[in-house]
Amino acid sequence: MQFSSVLPLEGKACMSPVRRGSGGYGSERMRINCCSIRRNKALRRMCFSARGAVSSTQCVLTSDAGPDTLVRPNHPFRRNYADPNEVAAVILGGGTGTQLFPLTSTRATPAVPIGGCYRLIDIPMSNCFNSGINKIFVMTQFNSASLNRHIHRTYLGGGINFTDGSVEVLAATQMPGEAAGWFQGTADAVRKFIWVLEDYYKHKAIEHILILSGDQLYRMDYMELVQKHVDDNADITLSCAPVGESRASDYGLVKFDSSGRVIQFSEKPKGAALEEMKVDTSFLNFATCTLPAEYPYIASMGVYVFKRDVLLDLLKSRYAELHDFGSEILPKALHEHNVQAYVFTDYWEDIGTIRSFFDANMALCEQPPKFEFYDPKTPFFTSPRYLPPTKSDKCRIKDAIISHGCFLRECAIEHSIVGVPSRLNSGCELKNTMMMGADLYETEDEISRLLAEGKVPIGVGENTKISNCIIDMNCQGWKERLHNKQRGRSKSPDRPGRRILIRSGIVVVLKNATIKDGTVI
């Protein structure tokens, strides 16, 4: 802090109300005696900007307001920092989950296990906490029992400490006079609970609404997205990611000008419309070692930031009849509102199909992996299970993720994920497989009793060879089975009676399935 001259020290130590002066940059004058303790505290408060950053503000003597008046010019380029306490996150629980069937036959999409011990809902939830956002709404609809249970155990029942934050689960419900109670789209899901959000706003200083999806894998500081939203004074900001030719038509694609303003939005274009959305991405700083030419499109991630009042106006008045953000509201809103793009160049994967789910899990086993759950600064949270370490006896393990609480006995595991708490017996070979694990332990005595009764214990049995498979929770199989003998074969018939389905060349063993001895697929 600098002073232009020595100030006279007269009068009692006191502070008078702030009044405007005639200095440049909209300066403010604060009348204060320079020898007081209050002066030191007041000047320190005024000369330090948000988040503890030291300001370049100067206190100078003016000639038109008396000898004891200090002028504090506001810095013309001072940044208006976004406050996480002014942000509320809304996580969409997804629809019927047909693309991820049969994994969603008994659970909602965000409740699908990933990475050995996590659920998909843990991704946006953890990103929120790591970003300092702790006011979260989760909107659920289909098969929500396991999702509600996981949220309660992890985030409400003694798992994560939120301090002054909150997590609220909002289940789809019918209101009086409504014929269709289910959500008709992403925007309709938020609209159905506008009354909850409005009531929340009456008591909380929420200025921005962050809309998130519950079926993606990525690590993001959401406050960087919100900060750009604030810096651009945007009404809506879309988080976007570069994508390649093969998957571009699966997403909503955007074009934006040099200022970052979105000028064109096309939802899942095909043919000539797809070619029209191609852009030059050479200006982007890719976090992964990729060439810009491999990613000539910019896709919307389904992550949006809205000004609170803008969102309420769009859903209640302006577009009250429209149901989806991506295909309906955003293409219209960009002509009437300041819609900005935030380009995210780190790892991002949309878990929308069985193939993308399988590939995303297998990518975690690569060396080096494209995505890491392991980061002490931004960890991912999940339900605390209090399991012991994995026990491994004479096993061969290569490029694999083994979760806690597993029993591995004389088996071989390569490029696979083994979930909690799994059991693999002697002679078992696991390759290119996602094994989700089990809900409970079976002791050695319980296993012996089940075998004596002719029943099948939970786990993978002796001399079983499994490759290119997804094995759901609590699967029971014991001796000499071979799954997916011909890797990549996609025309094999489903076996619903045996609770085995094939999707995109991947064998999916359904939850709680029992596989008979000698089964070959």
From Swiss-Prot:
Classification via Gene3D superfamilies: Hexapeptide repeat proteins, Spore Coat Polysaccharide Biosynthesis Protein SpsA, Chain A
One GO location term (cellular component): chloroplast
Keyword Plastid: yes
CDD domains per UniProt: ADP_Glucose_PP, LbH_G1P_AT_C
PROSITE patterns: ADP_GLC_PYROPHOSPH_1 (PS00808), ADP_GLC_PYROPHOSPH_2 (PS00809), ADP_GLC_PYROPHOSPH_3 (PS00810)
UniProt catalytic activity: alpha-D-glucose 1-phosphate + ATP + H(+) = ADP-alpha-D-glucose + diphosphate
One GO-annotated biological process of the protein: starch biosynthetic process
InterPro entries (alphabetical): ADP-Glc_PPase, ADP_Glu_pyroP_CS, NTP_transferase_dom, Nucleotide-diphossugar_trans, Trimer_LpxA-like_sf
Compartments (UniProt record): Plastid, Chloroplast; Plastid, Amyloplast
Subunit organization: Heterotetramer.
Function: This protein plays a role in synthesis of starch. It catalyzes the synthesis of the activated glycosyl donor, ADP-glucose from Glc-1-P and ATP.
The name this protein goes by in its record: Glucose-1-phosphate adenylyltransferase large subunit 2, chloroplastic/amyloplastic
Organism this protein belongs to: Zea mays (Maize)
Taxonomic lineage from the root: Eukaryota, Viridiplantae, Streptophyta, Embryophyta, Tracheophyta
Encoding gene (name): AGP2
